[in-house]
Protein backbone atom coordinates (compact mmCIF):
# COMPACT_ATOMS: atom_id res chain seq x y z
CA UNK A 1 0.00 0.00 0.00
CA UNK A 2 1.48 3.38 -1.03
CA UNK A 3 1.45 5.87 1.83
CA UNK A 4 1.86 9.58 1.18
CA UNK A 5 4.13 11.75 3.38
CA UNK A 6 2.36 14.01 5.90
CA UNK A 7 1.66 17.64 4.90
CA UNK A 8 4.55 20.06 5.31
CA UNK A 9 4.25 22.01 8.60
CA UNK A 10 3.95 25.82 8.38
CA UNK A 11 7.39 27.38 8.07
CA UNK A 12 8.61 29.43 11.03
CA UNK A 13 9.32 33.05 10.11
CA UNK A 14 12.96 34.02 9.55
CA UNK A 15 14.29 30.47 9.96
CA UNK A 16 16.54 31.03 6.99
CA UNK A 17 16.33 34.80 7.08
CA UNK A 18 19.95 35.32 8.22
CA UNK A 19 22.33 36.02 5.41
CA UNK A 20 25.14 33.55 4.95
CA UNK A 21 26.57 30.89 2.72
CA UNK A 22 24.68 27.75 1.74
CA UNK A 23 27.35 25.15 1.32
CA UNK A 24 26.84 22.68 -1.55
CA UNK A 25 24.41 24.83 -3.56
CA UNK A 26 25.89 28.29 -4.05
CA UNK A 27 28.35 29.80 -1.62
CA UNK A 28 27.50 33.35 -2.74
CA UNK A 29 23.72 33.15 -2.11
CA UNK A 30 22.31 36.12 -0.20
CA UNK A 31 19.55 34.58 1.94
CA UNK A 32 18.43 37.87 3.50
CA UNK A 33 16.64 38.96 0.33
CA UNK A 34 15.16 37.27 -2.72
CA UNK A 35 17.88 36.28 -5.19
CA UNK A 36 17.28 35.11 -8.74
CA UNK A 37 20.72 33.54 -8.86
CA UNK A 38 20.06 31.64 -5.63
CA UNK A 39 16.78 30.26 -6.98
CA UNK A 40 18.44 29.29 -10.24
CA UNK A 41 21.25 27.51 -8.39
CA UNK A 42 18.72 25.63 -6.26
CA UNK A 43 16.75 24.37 -9.26
CA UNK A 44 19.91 23.45 -11.18
CA UNK A 45 21.08 21.40 -8.18
CA UNK A 46 17.69 19.66 -7.92
CA UNK A 47 18.01 18.46 -11.53
CA UNK A 48 21.01 16.32 -10.68
CA UNK A 49 19.89 12.65 -10.36
CA UNK A 50 21.98 11.92 -7.27
CA UNK A 51 20.53 14.95 -5.44
CA UNK A 52 16.97 14.13 -6.51
CA UNK A 53 17.26 10.43 -5.53
CA UNK A 54 18.77 11.33 -2.16
CA UNK A 55 15.96 13.80 -1.47
CA UNK A 56 13.27 11.26 -2.40
CA UNK A 57 14.84 8.56 -0.22
CA UNK A 58 15.07 10.96 2.72
CA UNK A 59 11.45 12.07 2.27
CA UNK A 60 10.26 8.44 2.40
CA UNK A 61 12.16 7.71 5.62
CA UNK A 62 9.83 8.30 8.61
CA UNK A 63 12.81 8.82 10.93
CA UNK A 64 14.20 11.58 8.69
CA UNK A 65 10.78 13.22 8.45
CA UNK A 66 10.29 13.10 12.21
CA UNK A 67 13.83 14.40 12.85
CA UNK A 68 13.30 17.31 10.45
CA UNK A 69 10.07 18.17 12.23
CA UNK A 70 11.73 18.01 15.65
CA UNK A 71 14.58 20.30 14.51
CA UNK A 72 12.15 22.79 12.96
CA UNK A 73 10.21 22.98 16.24
CA UNK A 74 13.28 23.27 18.50
CA UNK A 75 14.89 26.73 18.38
CA UNK A 76 18.25 25.57 19.77
CA UNK A 77 18.55 22.67 17.31
CA UNK A 78 17.43 24.87 14.44
CA UNK A 79 20.14 27.44 15.19
CA UNK A 80 22.84 24.77 15.50
CA UNK A 81 21.92 23.26 12.12
CA UNK A 82 21.93 26.67 10.43
CA UNK A 83 25.36 27.43 11.90
CA UNK A 84 26.68 24.11 10.58
CA UNK A 85 25.30 24.93 7.12
CA UNK A 86 26.91 28.37 7.13
CA UNK A 87 30.22 27.17 8.55
CA UNK A 88 30.65 23.40 8.03
CA UNK A 89 33.50 23.09 10.50
CA UNK A 90 33.97 19.98 12.62
CA UNK A 91 32.92 21.74 15.81
CA UNK A 92 29.71 23.10 14.30
CA UNK A 93 28.79 19.70 12.85
CA UNK A 94 29.25 18.00 16.25
CA UNK A 95 27.20 20.71 17.97
CA UNK A 96 24.44 20.29 15.39
CA UNK A 97 24.41 16.50 15.84
CA UNK A 98 24.04 16.79 19.63
CA UNK A 99 21.31 19.42 19.23
CA UNK A 100 19.37 17.17 16.82
CA UNK A 101 19.66 14.19 19.19
CA UNK A 102 18.42 16.34 22.07
CA UNK A 103 15.43 17.51 19.98
CA UNK A 104 14.56 13.87 19.20
CA UNK A 105 14.69 12.96 22.89
CA UNK A 106 12.36 15.81 23.76
CA UNK A 107 9.85 14.63 21.16
CA UNK A 108 9.52 11.17 22.76
CA UNK A 109 6.78 12.49 25.05
CA UNK A 110 4.74 13.76 22.10
CA UNK A 111 2.59 11.25 20.15
CA UNK A 112 3.74 10.68 16.57
CA UNK A 113 1.40 11.67 13.76
CA UNK A 114 -0.89 8.78 12.79
CA UNK A 115 0.00 7.09 9.48
CA UNK A 116 -1.50 8.80 6.46
CA UNK A 117 -4.52 6.97 5.02
CA UNK A 118 -5.50 9.32 2.20
CA UNK A 119 -8.03 12.12 2.31
CA UNK A 120 -11.61 11.10 2.95
CA UNK A 121 -14.70 12.90 3.96
CA UNK A 122 -16.30 11.75 7.24
CA UNK A 123 -18.04 8.44 6.78
CA UNK A 124 -16.62 7.89 3.29
CA UNK A 125 -13.95 5.27 2.76
CA UNK A 126 -10.78 6.06 0.85
CA UNK A 127 -9.14 3.58 -1.52
CA UNK A 128 -6.54 2.52 1.05
CA UNK A 129 -9.20 2.40 3.73
CA UNK A 130 -11.39 0.14 1.59
CA UNK A 131 -8.43 -2.12 0.88
CA UNK A 132 -7.73 -2.54 4.60
CA UNK A 133 -11.42 -3.21 5.30
CA UNK A 134 -11.55 -5.76 2.45
CA UNK A 135 -8.48 -7.59 3.79
CA UNK A 136 -10.00 -7.80 7.27
CA UNK A 137 -13.35 -9.06 5.97
CA UNK A 138 -11.66 -11.73 3.83
CA UNK A 139 -9.88 -12.97 6.95
CA UNK A 140 -13.21 -12.81 8.89
CA UNK A 141 -11.69 -10.23 11.22
CA UNK A 142 -13.77 -7.27 12.26
CA UNK A 143 -16.19 -6.99 9.36
CA UNK A 144 -18.03 -4.58 11.57
CA UNK A 145 -16.22 -2.60 14.21
CA UNK A 146 -17.74 -3.06 17.59
CA UNK A 147 -18.97 0.11 19.17
CA UNK A 148 -19.07 0.57 22.89
CA UNK A 149 -22.67 1.70 22.67
CA UNK A 150 -23.99 -1.03 20.41
CA UNK A 151 -27.62 -1.83 21.12
CA UNK A 152 -29.56 -5.08 21.22
CA UNK A 153 -33.11 -6.14 20.37
CA UNK A 154 -35.53 -9.01 20.94
CA UNK A 155 -34.36 -12.25 19.27
CA UNK A 156 -35.74 -12.78 15.81
CA UNK A 157 -37.77 -15.93 15.24
CA UNK A 158 -36.79 -15.92 11.59
CA UNK A 159 -33.34 -17.51 11.46
CA UNK A 160 -30.60 -15.72 9.55
CA UNK A 161 -28.88 -17.28 6.57
CA UNK A 162 -25.24 -18.05 7.25
CA UNK A 163 -24.23 -17.02 3.75
CA UNK A 164 -24.45 -13.29 4.54
CA UNK A 165 -23.82 -11.59 7.85
CA UNK A 166 -26.20 -8.83 8.88
CA UNK A 167 -25.08 -5.77 10.82
CA UNK A 168 -28.45 -5.59 12.57
CA UNK A 169 -27.95 -7.92 15.50
CA UNK A 170 -30.80 -9.57 17.38
CA UNK A 171 -31.34 -8.76 20.98
CA UNK A 172 -29.73 -11.11 23.46
CA UNK A 173 -32.12 -13.55 25.13
CA UNK A 174 -33.05 -13.05 28.77
CA UNK A 175 -30.04 -13.49 31.07
CA UNK A 176 -29.35 -16.92 32.45
CA UNK A 177 -31.27 -17.20 35.74
CA UNK A 178 -28.22 -17.00 37.95
CA UNK A 179 -30.17 -17.81 41.11
CA UNK A 180 -31.16 -21.23 39.76
CA UNK A 181 -28.02 -22.23 37.86
CA UNK A 182 -24.46 -22.06 39.02
CA UNK A 183 -22.62 -19.93 36.45
CA UNK A 184 -18.93 -19.43 37.27
CA UNK A 185 -17.50 -15.93 37.42
CA UNK A 186 -15.18 -15.47 34.48
CA UNK A 187 -12.45 -13.15 35.66
CA UNK A 188 -10.06 -11.76 33.08
CA UNK A 189 -7.16 -14.22 32.73
CA UNK A 190 -3.52 -13.21 32.65
CA UNK A 191 -2.81 -11.95 29.15
CA UNK A 192 -0.84 -14.48 27.15
CA UNK A 193 -1.85 -13.34 23.66
CA UNK A 194 -0.14 -10.55 21.69
CA UNK A 195 -0.91 -7.20 23.29
CA UNK A 196 0.35 -3.68 23.85
CA UNK A 197 -0.27 -0.69 26.12
CA UNK A 198 -1.40 2.65 24.66
CA UNK A 199 1.33 5.30 25.00
CA UNK A 200 -0.82 8.17 23.75
CA UNK A 201 -4.48 9.09 23.36
CA UNK A 202 -5.85 8.44 19.86
CA UNK A 203 -9.16 9.70 18.46
CA UNK A 204 -10.37 7.60 15.49
CA UNK A 205 -10.83 9.46 12.21
CA UNK A 206 -12.51 6.68 10.19
CA UNK A 207 -15.19 4.12 10.91
CA UNK A 208 -12.89 1.10 11.23
CA UNK A 209 -10.43 2.74 13.62
CA UNK A 210 -10.41 2.27 17.39
CA UNK A 211 -9.96 5.00 20.00
CA UNK A 212 -7.25 4.84 22.66
CA UNK A 213 -6.54 6.41 26.02
CA UNK A 214 -3.14 6.31 27.67
CA UNK A 215 -2.76 3.03 29.55
CA UNK A 216 -5.42 1.08 27.62
CA UNK A 217 -4.63 -2.60 27.02
CA UNK A 218 -4.97 -3.64 23.37
CA UNK A 219 -5.08 -7.32 22.35
CA UNK A 220 -3.45 -7.56 18.92
CA UNK A 221 -4.97 -10.11 16.54
CA UNK A 222 -3.59 -9.04 13.14
CA UNK A 223 -0.88 -6.87 11.62
CA UNK A 224 -2.61 -4.98 8.81
CA UNK A 225 0.62 -3.44 7.47
CA UNK A 226 3.82 -1.86 8.77
CA UNK A 227 1.96 0.97 10.51
CA UNK A 228 -1.41 -0.46 11.61
CA UNK A 229 -2.61 -3.24 13.92
CA UNK A 230 -6.10 -4.72 14.28
CA UNK A 231 -7.16 -5.64 17.80
CA UNK A 232 -9.45 -5.19 20.80
CA UNK A 233 -9.31 -2.44 23.41
CA UNK A 234 -10.01 -4.35 26.61
CA UNK A 235 -10.65 -1.19 28.63
CA UNK A 236 -13.25 0.26 26.26
CA UNK A 237 -14.47 -3.08 24.83
CA UNK A 238 -14.11 -1.89 21.24
CA UNK A 239 -12.54 -3.40 18.12
CA UNK A 240 -10.70 -1.73 15.25
CA UNK A 241 -7.34 -0.76 13.82
CA UNK A 242 -4.83 1.53 15.55
CA UNK A 243 -1.44 3.01 14.60
CA UNK A 244 1.35 0.72 15.77
CA UNK A 245 3.41 3.75 16.85
CA UNK A 246 0.80 4.52 19.54
CA UNK A 247 1.34 1.18 21.32
CA UNK A 248 4.05 -0.07 23.66
CA UNK A 249 4.17 -3.71 22.52
CA UNK A 250 4.51 -6.14 25.43
CA UNK A 251 4.02 -9.44 23.57
CA UNK A 252 4.72 -9.18 19.82
CA UNK A 253 2.80 -11.26 17.32
CA UNK A 254 5.85 -13.35 16.35
CA UNK A 255 6.70 -14.28 19.94
CA UNK A 256 3.12 -15.19 20.66
CA UNK A 257 2.89 -17.60 17.71
CA UNK A 258 6.22 -19.30 18.44
CA UNK A 259 5.43 -19.94 22.10
CA UNK A 260 1.70 -20.42 22.55
CA UNK A 261 0.60 -21.21 26.11
CA UNK A 262 -1.20 -24.52 26.68
CA UNK A 263 -4.94 -24.26 26.15
CA UNK A 264 -6.88 -24.77 29.38
CA UNK A 265 -8.66 -28.10 29.64
CA UNK A 266 -12.24 -28.05 28.40
CA UNK A 267 -15.04 -28.96 30.85
CA UNK A 268 -15.64 -32.66 31.32
CA UNK A 269 -17.51 -34.17 28.41
CA UNK A 270 -17.16 -31.11 26.18
CA UNK A 271 -16.64 -31.48 22.46
CA UNK A 272 -13.19 -29.97 21.91
CA UNK A 273 -12.73 -28.54 18.47
CA UNK A 274 -16.33 -27.34 18.02
CA UNK A 275 -16.06 -23.78 16.73
CA UNK A 276 -18.66 -21.12 16.02
CA UNK A 277 -18.40 -18.04 13.81
CA UNK A 278 -19.83 -14.77 15.13
CA UNK A 279 -22.49 -13.39 12.78
CA UNK A 280 -23.12 -10.30 14.92
CA UNK A 281 -21.10 -8.13 17.29
CA UNK A 282 -21.82 -8.97 20.94
CA UNK A 283 -20.94 -6.33 23.52
CA UNK A 284 -22.21 -6.88 27.06
CA UNK A 285 -21.38 -5.19 30.34
CA UNK A 286 -22.54 -8.23 32.32
CA UNK A 287 -19.78 -9.93 34.31
CA UNK A 288 -19.04 -13.39 32.94
CA UNK A 289 -20.18 -12.65 29.37
CA UNK A 290 -17.83 -13.19 26.42
CA UNK A 291 -17.65 -10.22 24.03
CA UNK A 292 -16.65 -10.60 20.39
CA UNK A 293 -16.87 -8.98 16.97
CA UNK A 294 -18.53 -10.28 13.82
CA UNK A 295 -16.34 -12.88 12.14
CA UNK A 296 -14.59 -13.98 15.35
CA UNK A 297 -13.90 -17.70 15.75
CA UNK A 298 -15.16 -18.98 19.13
CA UNK A 299 -14.45 -22.41 20.60
CA UNK A 300 -17.74 -23.63 22.09
CA UNK A 301 -17.11 -25.63 25.26
CA UNK A 302 -20.66 -26.20 26.55
CA UNK A 303 -24.33 -25.29 26.20
CA UNK A 304 -25.61 -23.53 29.31
CA UNK A 305 -29.25 -23.77 28.18
CA UNK A 306 -31.24 -23.42 24.97
CA UNK A 307 -30.29 -19.76 24.45
CA UNK A 308 -26.80 -19.43 25.97
CA UNK A 309 -23.46 -21.03 25.14
CA UNK A 310 -20.11 -21.12 26.92
CA UNK A 311 -16.87 -20.66 25.00
CA UNK A 312 -13.42 -19.15 24.56
CA UNK A 313 -12.14 -16.38 22.27
CA UNK A 314 -8.88 -14.40 22.30
CA UNK A 315 -7.80 -16.23 25.47
CA UNK A 316 -10.96 -15.21 27.37
CA UNK A 317 -13.85 -17.38 28.55
CA UNK A 318 -17.49 -16.57 29.12
CA UNK A 319 -21.07 -17.13 28.06
CA UNK A 320 -22.87 -15.61 25.07
CA UNK A 321 -26.22 -15.89 23.22
CA UNK A 322 -26.44 -18.75 20.76
CA UNK A 323 -28.26 -16.72 18.09
CA UNK A 324 -25.26 -14.38 17.76
CA UNK A 325 -23.13 -17.16 16.23
CA UNK A 326 -23.29 -19.79 13.50
CA UNK A 327 -22.31 -23.24 14.77
CA UNK A 328 -23.20 -26.07 12.34
CA UNK A 329 -22.28 -28.80 14.87
CA UNK A 330 -23.94 -27.21 17.88
CA UNK A 331 -25.98 -30.34 18.64
CA UNK A 332 -22.69 -32.18 19.30
CA UNK A 333 -21.82 -29.85 22.20
CA UNK A 334 -23.11 -31.30 25.49
CA UNK A 335 -25.23 -29.39 27.97
CA UNK A 336 -23.32 -27.93 30.90
CA UNK A 337 -23.61 -30.09 34.00
CA UNK A 338 -25.74 -28.40 36.66
CA UNK A 339 -26.93 -29.31 40.11
CA UNK A 340 -29.56 -32.10 40.24
CA UNK A 341 -33.07 -30.76 40.07
CA UNK A 342 -36.36 -32.23 41.15
CA UNK A 343 -38.03 -30.89 38.00
CA UNK A 344 -39.68 -33.56 35.86
CA UNK A 345 -37.84 -34.84 32.81
CA UNK A 346 -39.30 -33.84 29.47
CA UNK A 347 -37.15 -36.10 27.33
CA UNK A 348 -38.66 -38.95 25.41
CA UNK A 349 -36.62 -42.12 25.23
CA UNK A 350 -35.42 -43.14 21.80
CA UNK A 351 -35.38 -46.77 20.84
CA UNK A 352 -31.81 -48.07 20.68
CA UNK A 353 -30.09 -48.63 17.37
CA UNK A 354 -30.65 -52.40 17.46
CA UNK A 355 -34.44 -52.10 17.23
CA UNK A 356 -36.88 -50.15 15.06
CA UNK A 357 -36.56 -46.38 15.39
CA UNK A 358 -39.44 -44.07 16.26
CA UNK A 359 -41.08 -42.09 13.45
CA UNK A 360 -42.87 -38.76 13.87
CA UNK A 361 -45.09 -36.72 11.55
CA UNK A 362 -44.22 -33.07 10.94
CA UNK A 363 -47.06 -30.69 11.81
CA UNK A 364 -45.66 -27.45 10.33
CA UNK A 365 -43.24 -26.38 7.61
CA UNK A 366 -39.76 -25.69 9.05
CA UNK A 367 -36.92 -23.95 7.18
CA UNK A 368 -34.58 -22.03 9.49
CA UNK A 369 -31.78 -21.51 6.98
CA UNK A 370 -29.28 -22.92 9.50
CA UNK A 371 -27.01 -25.57 8.01
CA UNK A 372 -27.35 -27.93 10.98
CA UNK A 373 -31.19 -27.92 10.87
CA UNK A 374 -33.42 -30.12 8.72
CA UNK A 375 -35.71 -28.51 6.17
CA UNK A 376 -39.18 -30.01 6.64
CA UNK A 377 -42.65 -29.70 5.21
CA UNK A 378 -46.02 -30.38 6.79
CA UNK A 379 -46.80 -34.08 6.58
CA UNK A 380 -43.18 -35.27 6.32
CA UNK A 381 -42.37 -38.39 8.34
CA UNK A 382 -39.02 -38.20 10.12
CA UNK A 383 -37.01 -40.76 12.09
CA UNK A 384 -36.01 -39.70 15.61
CA UNK A 385 -32.32 -40.42 16.27
CA UNK A 386 -31.51 -38.65 19.54
CA UNK A 387 -33.44 -36.66 22.13
CA UNK A 388 -31.15 -33.63 22.60
CA UNK A 389 -33.14 -31.77 25.28
CA UNK A 390 -36.65 -30.59 26.12
CA UNK A 391 -36.99 -28.57 22.90
CA UNK A 392 -34.77 -30.13 20.22
CA UNK A 393 -34.55 -33.49 18.49
CA UNK A 394 -31.87 -34.97 16.24
CA UNK A 395 -33.70 -36.66 13.36
CA UNK A 396 -33.34 -37.99 9.82
CA UNK A 397 -35.47 -37.20 6.79
CA UNK A 398 -34.87 -37.99 3.11
CA UNK A 399 -31.38 -39.30 3.89
CA UNK A 400 -30.27 -36.15 5.75
CA UNK A 401 -29.70 -35.70 9.48
CA UNK A 402 -30.19 -32.49 11.46
CA UNK A 403 -31.87 -30.66 14.29
CA UNK A 404 -35.64 -30.19 14.55
CA UNK A 405 -37.65 -28.18 17.14
CA UNK A 406 -40.16 -30.47 18.86
CA UNK A 407 -42.88 -27.81 18.69
CA UNK A 408 -43.06 -28.36 14.91
CA UNK A 409 -43.76 -32.08 15.31
CA UNK A 410 -46.83 -34.12 16.05
CA UNK A 411 -47.28 -36.52 19.00
CA UNK A 412 -45.54 -37.63 21.12
CA UNK A 413 -43.32 -34.53 20.95
CA UNK A 414 -45.68 -31.77 19.86
CA UNK A 415 -49.39 -31.18 19.57
CA UNK A 416 -51.51 -32.11 16.57
CA UNK A 417 -51.97 -29.24 14.18
CA UNK A 418 -55.15 -27.30 14.73
CA UNK A 419 -57.87 -27.05 12.16
CA UNK A 420 -57.23 -24.64 9.28
CA UNK A 421 -57.56 -20.98 10.12
CA UNK A 422 -61.03 -19.56 9.79
CA UNK A 423 -61.97 -16.80 7.40
CA UNK A 424 -61.97 -13.17 8.45
CA UNK A 425 -65.76 -13.09 8.76
CA UNK A 426 -65.80 -16.14 11.05
CA UNK A 427 -62.98 -14.68 13.12
CA UNK A 428 -64.94 -11.48 13.61
CA UNK A 429 -67.80 -13.47 15.09
CA UNK A 430 -65.83 -15.95 17.18
CA UNK A 431 -62.93 -13.78 18.31
CA UNK A 432 -63.34 -10.05 18.82
CA UNK A 433 -60.12 -8.12 18.10
CA UNK A 434 -58.06 -7.21 21.14
CA UNK A 435 -55.77 -4.20 21.40
CA UNK A 436 -52.13 -4.85 22.23
CA UNK A 437 -48.70 -3.21 22.22
CA UNK A 438 -45.48 -4.73 20.82
CA UNK A 439 -42.84 -5.05 23.55
CA UNK A 440 -40.08 -6.01 21.12
CA UNK A 441 -39.08 -6.12 17.46
CA UNK A 442 -40.12 -8.95 15.16
CA UNK A 443 -38.71 -8.43 11.68
CA UNK A 444 -39.51 -11.37 9.45
CA UNK A 445 -39.24 -11.55 5.67
CA UNK A 446 -41.97 -14.21 5.50
CA UNK A 447 -45.04 -12.56 3.89
CA UNK A 448 -47.29 -14.57 6.23
CA UNK A 449 -45.72 -12.92 9.27
CA UNK A 450 -46.32 -9.40 10.56
CA UNK A 451 -43.38 -6.96 10.55
CA UNK A 452 -43.51 -5.40 14.02
CA UNK A 453 -41.37 -2.77 15.75
CA UNK A 454 -41.31 -2.22 19.48
CA UNK A 455 -44.04 0.22 20.54
CA UNK A 456 -46.41 -0.54 17.63
CA UNK A 457 -50.12 -0.64 18.51
CA UNK A 458 -51.70 -3.90 17.36
CA UNK A 459 -55.08 -5.51 16.84
CA UNK A 460 -55.01 -9.24 17.69
CA UNK A 461 -57.59 -11.02 15.55
CA UNK A 462 -56.77 -14.69 16.21
CA UNK A 463 -55.12 -16.89 18.82
CA UNK A 464 -53.27 -19.25 16.47
CA UNK A 465 -51.68 -21.62 19.00
CA UNK A 466 -49.62 -21.63 22.19
CA UNK A 467 -46.85 -19.60 20.57
CA UNK A 468 -48.38 -17.26 17.99
CA UNK A 469 -51.10 -14.64 17.49
CA UNK A 470 -52.45 -13.36 14.21
CA UNK A 471 -52.87 -9.60 14.12
CA UNK A 472 -52.43 -6.38 12.22
CA UNK A 473 -51.07 -2.91 12.86
CA UNK A 474 -53.74 -0.60 14.26
CA UNK A 475 -52.56 2.19 11.98
CA UNK A 476 -52.98 -0.04 8.90
CA UNK A 477 -56.24 -1.89 9.53
CA UNK A 478 -56.92 -2.38 5.83
CA UNK A 479 -53.76 -4.46 5.33
CA UNK A 480 -53.87 -8.27 5.75
CA UNK A 481 -53.24 -9.76 9.19
CA UNK A 482 -49.98 -11.56 9.90
CA UNK A 483 -48.49 -13.97 12.40
CA UNK A 484 -46.36 -12.74 15.30
CA UNK A 485 -44.98 -14.41 18.46
CA UNK A 486 -46.88 -14.06 21.71
CA UNK A 487 -43.81 -13.31 23.79
CA UNK A 488 -43.42 -9.83 22.25
CA UNK A 489 -47.09 -8.86 22.69
CA UNK A 490 -48.71 -7.22 25.71
CA UNK A 491 -52.50 -7.28 25.63
CA UNK A 492 -54.27 -4.17 26.86
CA UNK A 493 -57.12 -4.43 29.33
From Swiss-Prot:
Compositionally biased intervals (Polar residues): 16-28
A Pfam family it matches: SH3_1
Compositional bias of kind Pro residues: 1-12
Domain SH3, first and last residues per copy: 191-252, 271-330, 355-414, 431-493
Keywords on record: Repeat, SH3 domain
Domain of life of the source: Eukaryota
Stretches for region Disordered: 1-28, 102-130, 142-187
GO BP, one annotated term: cell migration
Protein name as catalogued: Uncharacterized protein B0303.7
The organism of origin for this protein: Caenorhabditis elegans
Amino acid sequence: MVRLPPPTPPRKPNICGTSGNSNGINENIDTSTFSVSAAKALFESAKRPEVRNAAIAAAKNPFVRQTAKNVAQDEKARGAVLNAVKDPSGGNKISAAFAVADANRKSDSVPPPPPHRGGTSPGKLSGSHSAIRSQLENMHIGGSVMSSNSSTATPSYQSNSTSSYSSSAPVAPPPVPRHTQSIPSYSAPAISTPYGIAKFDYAPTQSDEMGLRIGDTVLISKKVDAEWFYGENQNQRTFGIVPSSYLDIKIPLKEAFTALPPRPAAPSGSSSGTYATAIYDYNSNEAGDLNFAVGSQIMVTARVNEEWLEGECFGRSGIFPSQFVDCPNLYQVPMKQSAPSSAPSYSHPITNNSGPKQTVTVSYDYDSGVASDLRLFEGDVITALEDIDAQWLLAECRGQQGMVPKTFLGPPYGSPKKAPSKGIAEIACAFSPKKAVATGDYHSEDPKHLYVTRGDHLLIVEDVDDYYYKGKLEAFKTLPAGILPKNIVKLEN
